[in-house]
Amino acid sequence: MKGKHRVGLGALVLVLLMATVAYPVLLYTDNAFVSKWRTLYIETAMSTMSHQWLATAFIPQSIIDEVMQTRAETTELQRTAESTWNVGDVTSAIVESEEIEDDEERFYTLFNELDKKSFESYLEDHEDVLEKGWDRIAIDKCDEESDTGIRTKQGDTVLAISAKQGILIVAVKGETYRGRLAIVKDASRVELKTCEELFDVGQYIKDIAKDEDAILAINASGFIDADGVGNGGTPYGYLKVAGKELQGPYEHGYKIVGFDEDDLMQIGDSNITDNLWDAVEFGPALMVDGESKLKSASSGWGLQPRTAIGQAADKTVLMLVIDGRSTRSAGAT
């Protein structure tokens, strides 16, 4: 019995030591590793609707306020975020490739992100890929999640290539996240679509894609979620589809993003809406005209599932989806 009492007392002493020593250290240390994860923990908890107590229950409000100050500073940076480019600033990747006569050279010019050596190795092992020619190359390993061995020049794994559709899909991963990046070469094919019963009941993306006969789809914006029981039928903020304005801007610190008639993605406020064909309102804007519009990597939002869209200087559209809130992928900053 005495042995059990000693074990119990030892455990109690250990808990007390952790409470009196480890807890203050975790809260106030400037250690880079601890500070990084403390900040991400607070930001992630405070960015939820119903789980903010995970931070407020045992972290002093002063520390929470200090961490969340970066969100306010990012919001201030967002006020001046507005793109300024026009059609004279770009050359289309599609146009550049079409000017080349050799099929192989045209393929590598269009998909300039590909690491040529790794793709050649793949072709050696899969001779059937070229049976219909370079302009009909079609590889799709997205569902299998297997390593194709094909790499981008940055070292990411390529999961799918469609020469006919002008689409490349890449697996992206980091310390806390996994996701997919779709690289779309023809910006004119990117369109904004809505759920069938807009302002009434929402739809899953896969169902909207099926209805519209789309081969690729991602979320465009958030939706009104009153008291956490919204049905996804009403999008958050400005909405313009095929030149028709369906909902006005909210302008609560978010930006309007959309495509103009030259297929250029523009970012700004309500003053740019007349020039847009398709547009939504959300945020934050990450980069505008090549410059960051964030105060820090996380900017007060922590680790979350993410959807992002961007456009390169050659009009290539980048569509990114990051999984989150799972053991496999906590999310990205």
Give a label for each model feature:
Residues 3-247:
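Zymogen propeptides
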Residues 176-181, 253-254, 303-308:
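Short glycine-rich loop/turn motifs
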Residues 183, 215-219, 258, 310, ...:
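Structural recognition of the beta-strand scaffold that forms the well-ordered cores
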Residues 184-188, 258-264, 289, 311-315:
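Short acidic-glycine loop/turn motifs at beta-strand connectors
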Residues 188-189, 222-226, 273, 300, ...:
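Solvent-exposed loop/turn segments at secondary-structure junctions
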Residues 197-201, 271-275, 322-326:
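Short, solvent-exposed aromatic-acidic interface loops
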Residues 223-298:
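Active-site-adjacent helix-turn-beta-strand microarchitecture at beta-sheet edges
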Residues 288-333:
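Domain-core and long-helix interface of multi-subunit machines
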